[in-house]
Amino acid sequence: MLDQDSNARPWLLLAPVLLFLAVLAAAALAVIRMSVGSNGDEWRSVSLSSYADLATPYYMKSLWLTLRLAFQSTVLAVLLAIPVAIAMARAKSKLARRLLLTGVLLPLLVNLLLQSYGWLIILGPGGVLNNSLLALGIVQRPVQWLYRENGVLLGLIQTAFPLAALPMASALKAISGSYEEAAATMGASRWQILRHVLLPLAMPGILSGALLVFAYNASAFAVPLLLGGRRVSMLAVLVRDQITPLLNWPAASATSVVLMLATLAVMALSQKLVHRSQKMLGNTR
């Protein structure tokens, strides 16, 4: 009896997780099924017309815009996260580590809508950013940030920044300081230590953070809707437009499936390229 109880206990602990994954899988299958249905008869009919409609230039432009903004925000978020992650991993003061961690986690703790409204205040014609640029004499008149790609890009970087910084900080913290000391002893500069020692060793964490940021921003909805409006039509916004006024569930589902497949394809390709580059780097050594 004791052996049976001990064998069953891990499954009991996994039951909530398995149930949650089953619900997610069921929801994904429901979306896929509706994507091959007809409007008004989603569950009984079979039609690929919703996918055919996505081949229009309007949807292709939106798909390209979504992937491009997700990629740009990923690159910039990772670059900005490198010094923050190094500071989090190498800070000796416990207070400094806590303050850095709190600052990084803040975007995850504040509601996404509130963050987007905050960006509306910052990026508006009379907002903080424009007033600062005017006061410094950098610009002569307010810059139009809202309802432009640049404004959406800033919002995407800020909201997804923790996803880039946290895995990177964890990977850097696991690297022994003896590597840096050995490189410094051999005359390496700080830039050389960062480029040839820290970044290659932290590449798994960097890649994990980059993939998280890309997947998160490719499916972003609140930020492009509030900061971009109809002028920056990312695919998630088009999904909402198909549902709210039109109730066209097959079209919305097909758009979601295409977005999911495109995101997975880009993530798989990037991971393969990184693994290949790491293998080539290892062979050269």
Residue ranges of model-derived segments:
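Membrane-water interface segments at the C-terminal ends of transmembrane alpha-helices
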Residues: 8-40, 57-173, 197-221, 228, ...
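Glycine-rich helix-loop "coupling/hinge" segments at transmembrane-helix boundaries
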Residues: 40-43, 221-247, 284-285
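Short, Lys/Arg-rich, polar N-terminal cytosolic tail immediately upstream
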Residues: 1-7
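Glycine/proline-centered hinge or cleavage motifs at structural transition points of membrane proteins
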Residues: 186-188, 200
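The alpha-helix within a helix-turn-helix
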Residues: 183
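Short cytosolic juxtamembrane segments of multi-pass membrane proteins
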Residues: 273-285
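A short amphipathic helical element positioned immediately N-terminal to and/or at the very start
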Residues: 46-55
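Short glycine/proline-centered loop/turn elements that form peptide/ligand docking sites
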Residues: 175-179, 279
